[in-house]
Structure formats: C-alpha cells, structure tokens
Amino acid sequence: MTSTYHDLYLKIRMSLSSAGIEAAQLEAREILCAASGKTAEELYRDISLYTTEAIAEQALALQERRLAGEPIAYLVGEWSFCGLPFYVSPAALIPRVDTEMLAQLAMNRLKEHQGSTRVLDLCAGTGCVGLTVAALMKNTRAVLVDLSDGALDLCKRNIRRHKLTGRAVYLKGDALQPPSHALGQFDVLVCNPPYIPTGDLAGLDASVKGFEPMMALDGGADGLDFYRGITSLWQPALKPGGHLLYEVGIGQAEQVAWLLVKAGYENIRITRDTGGIDRVVEGQRPKEQEIPDLLHETLEEEG
C-alpha cells in the first residue's frame, strides 16, 4: 500500500534516528530525493502527494543500506563540496568539509600569480579540489591525476557536470613516480594523499573502512609515504615561485613541513581547520634558486 511522501519521510527519519544517526532528518530527505529523482525543492512541493510503490521500495532499500553502515553520499551518488555538487562512488573518498580549506588556500595562492594559471590536483579522487578551483577561477586550467580508473571516471563525469571540458583534463598517473615532462609546470600543486598509517586502518570507523577505498587511505607505516615521494619527485612540475599544498592528518603537520624545508621550499605555512587541527601544510618553490631537477637525475641514472 502506498503512502504519502511525508509519511514515508517520517518513517525513514525515525528508523535512522533510532539507529543513532545524528543527521537523520537530512539523510531521510536525501534518501527520498534519490529514490524519487526529485530535488529537495520538488520534494517539499510534493510532500503531501502519494508515492508510487516503486519509489517506496527503493527508498526503503536505501534506508536498509544506510542502516548497514553505507555512507549516505554513496547511497545518493553525489555530495557537496564548497557549495558545488560532485558525483561520488566507492571508487574515491567522499569530499569532506575539512578539505574545503585546501581548495580555498589554493585559490588564494593562485591569486598571487598574474594572468592565466594552472593547478595540478594530484591524488585527485573525485577531482573536487581541482575542479572547484577551476569552476570558481575562470582564468585557471586544471589537470587531475589519479592512479585509480574508477576515480578517473568520476573526474571525467565531474568535469562534464561543471562544464569544464575546455579547462580541465584528467590523466592516469602514479604520485610515487616522477611526472611526465608532457605535464608541463603548474602555479599550484594541491594534494590530499593517502595519509592514514597502515596500522591505524583497522581502527577506522566502519563506514570508512567498510566502504571507502583503501588505496586512498593507506599512507604507509607512518602515513607519510606519499608526502616523501611527492615532495621529492614532483618538484619539476612546479614553476619557480609555485606553491605546493598538502592536506595532512592529525599530528603530521610538523613532519610534513620539515620535508618541505629539507627539499628547499620557502614560506612554509601550516593552517588549522575550523576544529583547530593543523590541516594544510604548504611551501613555495624558490623564485630564483634552482631546486635540483630530480626527474632529470632519475632518468640519467636509469640511462
């Protein structure tokens, strides 16, 4: 027997709330929107109308998946980042509010450069950081690099979603290998790499370790493998005077900052997030002093 959208909403909200889900009201709405194909505005407009049996069945199926621990973002297939919608899937991490600071700081640094600019989003995942920068800065071109085919498919879809096909591209690449000369150089390199120590993965929340990709989480024994590799190998991809910005995990900021110091970066900064946690570490490639081109050295050694 069918029920109204309002009755179905109340039923789902009560089930989620009883399971201890804090944002039960928001998530019940998201589930109904996903099941019905309606926007939030359309759902409010039609809230007193009757649903179809198919919509009710789909909504209750999504509810059960949520009760089993699956993140709401994966259930609905998209999530908001810096006020922009992005397609998501279990192939990439869900965009998080903490990471919005990385995008904002990247835009701040790009404003220091004259004319058209280029941003490289390494370990791009959904592409949310690089594409947010490109969407909000009309003179910026973005290159999104990831090793995961599933993540690259999300990048492709999100480029199209935000009508950025003329200013953004996605490429398959390994952050722990030297960059290709074909990439050219960038004004800003942003990266939210895997940074969870391997030994801590088992202790992650079930909604994370059970659904989000391990390759996007595992940062090696101390969580710093990607910071070491990228800091040394990807220097040639930055223009002199260009900025490298990392998101970091709790307690990692000083160690990552020291990696940048040892690599010759200047103007090292650590920025805290809204929770008071050191979240972004950045450094600037010197404008005059040449940093050793480790890519050339690597190629010469191989030759």
Say what each PLM segment does:
Residues L32-R109:
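Conserved AdoMet
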Residues E100-G203:
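Conserved SAM/SAH cofactor-binding pocket of Class I
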Residues P286-G303:
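Flexible, glycine-/basic-rich loop-and-beta segments that form/coincide
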Residues L16, L110, I159, W234, ...:
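Conserved hydrophobic residues forming the short capping helix/wall of the S-adenosyl-L-methionine
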Residues Y195-F226:
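Mobile active-site "lid"/loop adjacent to the S-adenosyl-L-methionine
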Residues M1-Y44, S48-T51:
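Non-catalytic accessory regions of SAM-dependent methyltransferases
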Residues A221-R285:
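Conserved Class I SAM-dependent methyltransferase catalytic core
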Residues L164, E212, L238-P240:
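Helix-to-beta-strand junctions that scaffold the AdoMet/dcAdoMet cofactor pocket
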